Amino acid sequence: MERVRDLASEKAAVIFTKSSCCMCHSIKTLFYELGASPAIHELDKDPQGPDMERALFRVFGSNPAVPAVFVGGRYVGSAKDVISFHVDGSLKQMLKASNAIWL
C-alpha cells in the first residue's frame, strides 16, 4: 500500500487503471476533457501492478479495484463515484481545489 500511497500523491490527479478496462478509459477521457492531466498508472503494465491492485481492493473495497481515482492525494472513488461527482459538479471543484485544473 505504501507504493500506492506514494504514487497517489505524486500529482494533483492520479488514476490507477488497466489498459483493457473500458471504464478506466472513460474516466481518463473525462479528466482530459475537464482540462486535467492526471498521472496514469496502468496496473497491468507494472510489475508491481497485481500487488497494488490487491492493496487498492483491501483498503478501499471497490470491486473491481480500478479505476481508482485520487485527487489532491485523497481517494475520490471508483468510476461510479467519479461520474456522480461529475454530474453534481463537485468533481470540477475538487480538481480546481487541488490545482489539477485552473479554469
From Swiss-Prot:
It is found in: Cytoplasm. Gene3D superfamilies: Glutaredoxin. GO terms for biological process: negative regulation of transcription by RNA polymerase II. Residues 1-102 form the Glutaredoxin domain. Transmembrane segments: none annotated. Keywords: Cytoplasm, Disulfide bond, Electron transport, Redox-active center, Transport. It comes from the Eukaryota. Disulfide bonds join 21-24. One of its GO terms (cellular component) is cytoplasm. Has a glutathione-disulfide oxidoreductase activity in the presence of NADPH and glutathione reductase. Reduces low molecular weight disulfides and proteins. PANTHER family: GLUTAREDOXIN (PTHR10168). Belongs to the glutaredoxin family. CC-type subfamily. This is Putative glutaredoxin-C12. It comes from Arabidopsis thaliana (Mouse-ear cress). The gene is GRXC12.
